[in-house]
Design a protein with these regions (language model features):
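C-terminal regulatory/interaction module of P-loop NTP-utilizing enzymes
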Residues: 1-403
Length: 403
């Protein structure tokens, strides 16, 4: 049978999770070892940032561990030495605060007005005022002239001089080109003489009323693109999350709001988690020895189970093969309560498909000896798998499967 392309399976999942992430901002991919949680997290990053995401400043990945603290992840103190050899304790941003600042800077800048838009809005406003003035002049005079042209109409989106219908957009564009940008190569698309005459008269009117365009502070030359920033936290439940996140548990939900922190960095106690910062955690559900995710944190994350599946009909990388026979045999151990402890759910512990992919450097025998068997024996030791059932030892079952 010809192998099917696995793109629809993965793409549908990624597309669905992107929509979830855009709404919730925080997502945890949970499942047994080897189900591809980190792989899917990176696929999400590629979808939201681009295929070269790992080289981008918009992407970070960190792995939690039991001794991970707030001072490692959010803000902490570093010790420096001055010129006299004295120790100085300096509050500093760590991974999350630093990344959040970068994301927030982009978010704020992307909402700033560009210079081009600012100029356009200013000229439109002045042109509107000038049209109001022209309308008033027409009511009190029989002939109102713009240069040598008689003004015959002032309408919501244009004026009429002589036989020429000049749109507001035409005059505004021409005024910006000549009077602000000093673009000598600009030529109006039509009504050349009438347009330049109107621009000249309009310019004189503004000068008489002391109106000159000046770019205000904070206006950017070019519009800044709003970018997505992705932080992957691998093994997120291995750390004590309430301790690591601290007051930022609030910020996870209330994006864009200032949250006061324990440390003052460069005169500012606050941290903002902006709407364009997305957090993806991965969680090994088989590991019961790690930290518990409490309800306050759980409420702020969306959770998605990534389950073990048979991928024999999915496209793999060159040189990779999926041992579906071995996969199916091992999965049977978890299919019922014969060997699986009643306290556990199959989807939390069933060994993932990545354990059954062989390559030129990772043979079937190596997978079994160094990965599959050690994990299953750890499961037995932890009580996930029963040592015996109906007088049969599980080691006998493993020996018959793993050969």
């Amino acid at each position: 049978m010809a192998k099917q392309n696995n793109k629809p399976i993965i793409d549908d999942l990624i597309s669905s999770l992107v929509q979830v992430l855009k709404v919730k901002k925080n997502l945890i991919l949970q499942g047994a070892p080897g189900t591809g949680k980190t792989y899917i997290a990176k696929k999400l990053a590629a979808s939201m940032i681009g295929k070269d995401f790992e080289e981008s400043s918009q992407f970070k990945i960190v792995q939690f561990h039991p001794s991970y603290t707030y001072e490692d992840f959010v803000r902490g103190i570093i010790v420096t030495t001055d010129n006299d050899g004295n120790l100085t304790y300096v509050p500093t941003n760590k991974i999350l605060a630093d990344f959040a600042k970068e994301a927030n800077d982009n978010y704020v800048d992307s909402h700033k007005e560009s210079l081009a838009v600012n100029k356009l809005n200013w000229v439109r406003e002045q042109w509107s005022k000038y049209k109001t003035y022209l309308s008033q002049e027409m009511q009190g005079n029989e002939d109102v002239k713009i240069g040598n042209y008689i003004l015959t109409g002032v309408n919501p989106s244009n004026i009429v001089i002589g036989t020429y219908n000049l749109s507001d957009n035409l005059i505004v564009e021409a005024y910006i080109a000549r009077e602000i940008d000093h673009d000598k190569e600009y030529t109006p698309p039509y009504f050349l003489k009438a347009t330049w005459t109107t621009v000249s008269v309009f310019s004189s009117y503004l000068q008489e009323h002391n109106q000159t365009y000046q770019a205000p502070n904070g206006v950017l030359k070019d519009k800044i693109e709003l970018k997505n920033f992705i932080l992957i936290i691998d093994e997120i439940n291995r750390a004590n999350l309430p301790m690591v996140l601290g007051e930022l548990i609030y910020a996870l939900e209330y994006r864009g709001r200032k949250v006061e922190t324990l440390y003052n960095v460069e005169g500012d106690n606050n941290i903002i988690l902006p709407p364009n910062l997305y957090i993806i955690g991965t969680m090994n559900t088989a590991d019961r020895s790690v930290g518990h995710i409490d309800y306050a944190i759980r409420r702020r994350f969306a959770f998605e189970y990534i389950e073990s599946r048979n991928i024999k009909d999915e496209k793999l990388q060159d040189g990779e093969k999926f041992d579906d026979k071995l996969f199916n045999s091992v999965q049977k151990i978890f299919d019922n309560q014969t060997w699986l402890s009643e306290e556990f759910d199959k989807r939390d512990v069933a060994i993932g498909h990545s354990y059954f992919i062989t390559t030129k450097v990772m043979s079937r025998e190596m997978r079994i000896k160094y990965e599959i068997r050690p994990l299953l024996e750890e499961y037995i030791k932890d009580g996930i798998l029963k040592k015996e059932y109906g007088g049969k030892q599980i080691q006998e079952e493993l020996n018959s499967i793993l050969k």
